Amino acid sequence: MDKNDYLKAVDSLNLWAKAYYTDDSPMASDDEYDKLYNAVVQFEKENPDLKLSYSPTNRIGGEILDEFKKISHIEKMWSMEDIFSDSELVAWISRGDKTDCEFFAEPKFDGASLNLLYENGNLISAATRGDGSVGEDVTNNAKVISSVPLQIDYKDKIEIRGEVVITKDDFELINIERSKNSEPPLANPRNAAAGSLRQLDNGIVKQRKLKFYPWGVGENSLKFNKHSQIMDFVRSLGFLHDNFCKVIRGIDELKIAYKELLSVRELKPILMDGMVIRVNDLSKANQLGYTVKFPKFMVAYKFPATEKTARLIDILLQVGRTGVVTPVGLLDGVLIDGAFIKNVTLHNFDEIDRLNLMKNDFVTVIRSGDVIPKITGVFKDRRDGSQSEIIRPKICPKCGNELLDEGVFIKCQNLTCKARVVSSIIYFASKKCMNIDGLGDAIVELLYQKNIIKDIADIYRLDELSFIGLEGFKTKKISNLLSAINNSKTPNLDKFIASLGIEHIGEVAAKKIANNYGDRWLELTLEELLALDGFGEAMALSYLEFMRVNLEKIKELLEFITPKMQNLELKTNIFSGKTVVITGTLSRSRDEFKAELESYGAKVSSSVSKKTDFVLYGNEAGSKLEKANELGVRAIDESEYESLK
């Protein structure tokens, strides 16, 4: 094989692969493909400098990474607003004058979003959605997904977005194989797809038989007027497409399409959890714009939750960071939307009483999307005498101490109870609290079991020697974790207070304490707490009791952490002491405006009433602005806001 033969062979192999994997119309036998493929492999071994970036041999798995790098998306990957009923669909269409719009409808596959970047026709990178702006670099894994072209017939820079999925059949085969190897089953196809994308060994990724279905583009220089035209073009480049993609006009047609897709839900080889509806006209979509979270021109009309019948075998007891004992139902196992469900939440023992639930009952189990499965009903007529009463516990299942029964809640009051300690550490390190990246549930459990950490303060005593002998902890992983811990040592005071896990004291309450009392937060009185807006006696007493019991532990923690105090000298202006509602799309995020207004001493509310002083509005303000006008509330746009502050 010479260079010209090699170039032709690569083109042929890519063409045959597309015909086989994408078009489901083979152009060559397996034997013919394998012979040509092996010839290409041999040529590339002998001529490594001539190897093409889009050679099919680049799909060979086996590369193992230490970690994933981060990649910034050129265009943000937005989340979608969810709706669940025809009435919500009508309301969505009525917002922004979408009544006469043409819509593009397609299945919402239940998988993991992926952003592919192509330049000069070559696949440059692949990244997960991440936080919408920055994702993880999974390029090596994307290259072994057969339905991701390594090269496309389009030279300009373009981001192609889509969903990585696993078929129901392939998912079942994966779990059969895992069972043979005494490995735990994967939870569901969606988690399997997401988890596969994040495998450091792309040999495993190749075995999982992932598929990529595009649903949109990010950065591009295309000249089309409609989203449907963009998708036709993308699919012409060699990507998969589903046969249910429709251009629709009017609410009635959308309802018909939704019912049609719902009727074939179980027949589809891939899990779907709804129908995506978007405004087809790109100029109209651009005009509609975005909220802080979602595009206003598209929505996911979710399918109803799936209900199944199962048998309740037993009740497990979990103990949380505040000591609350939560009952969890153990089922005989039922398959719902590709997920094998064995555990269901029961919230508290009052819920068990409300359902009149007994062990060994047949029950109705419901699961919708990411919602934790729960029991919604009991088939009392099917009781056969084998049922038994569920007894309220009196002893903590984790530490053996006596429980306090408060009615709705049953609590373990032992502050050194293992379950409470571990849950507290996990909560403290979580993303919404101190955001210690890499210190997740499993690692906290492991470090606690090995007696490496026994309380929150021990997190800050960790060093390289702490991880000696622990499986899976390589130098880079340890370095990243210690760096994340070090970066958490100067949080805002409100974030630190919220991270302590004080019952009834969340982000909002913690912010009020920090903003009003600053460095006096450890020595507040009941009267001072009750003086705060929104603080009731239960919140105030909970805070004071936590400080009384845990003061020494908090002081120990403050030897490592230096919370940043908020500036208590508030800048006063026209907004000080006023109630403000923010609505519409502004030049900055709503959270930024909210923080700024609160720094002036304003209260930011989510709804307009007679007590509202100002409504700060942006584009597509909607009903809140209308209500402000009806009530005579002063409405100001962003430019007026800037002049007043």
UniProtKB/Swiss-Prot annotation:
Keywords: DNA damage, DNA repair, DNA replication, Ligase, Magnesium, Manganese, Metal-binding, NAD, Zinc. GO terms for cellular component: cytosol. NAD(+) binds at residues 30-34, 79-80, 106, 129, 163, 302. One of its GO terms (molecular function) is DNA ligase (NAD+) activity. Residues 570-645 form the BRCT domain. InterPro entries: BRCT_dom, BRCT_dom_sf, DisA/LigA_HHH, DNA_ligase, DNA_ligase_AS, DNAligase_adenylation, DNAligase_N, NA-bd_OB-fold. Zn(2+) binds at residues 396, 399, 412, 417. GO terms for biological process: DNA repair; DNA replication. Its EC number is 6.5.1.2. It is an enzyme of class 6 (ligase). Its cofactor is Mg(2+); Mn(2+). Pfam families: BRCT, DNA_ligase_aden, DNA_ligase_OB, HHH_2. Gene3D superfamilies: 5' to 3' exonuclease, C-terminal subdomain (1.10.150.20), BRCT domain (3.40.50.10190), DNA ligase/mRNA capping enzyme (3.30.470.30), Helix hairpin bin (1.10.287.610), Nucleic acid-binding proteins (2.40.50.140). The active site is at residue 108. It catalyses: NAD(+) + (deoxyribonucleotide)n-3'-hydroxyl + 5'-phospho-(deoxyribonucleotide)m = (deoxyribonucleotide)n+m + AMP + beta-nicotinamide D-nucleotide. Belongs to the NAD-dependent DNA ligase family. LigA subfamily. DNA ligase that catalyzes the formation of phosphodiester linkages between 5'-phosphoryl and 3'-hydroxyl groups in double-stranded DNA using NAD as a coenzyme and as the energy source for the reaction. It is essential for DNA replication and repair of damaged DNA. This is DNA ligase.
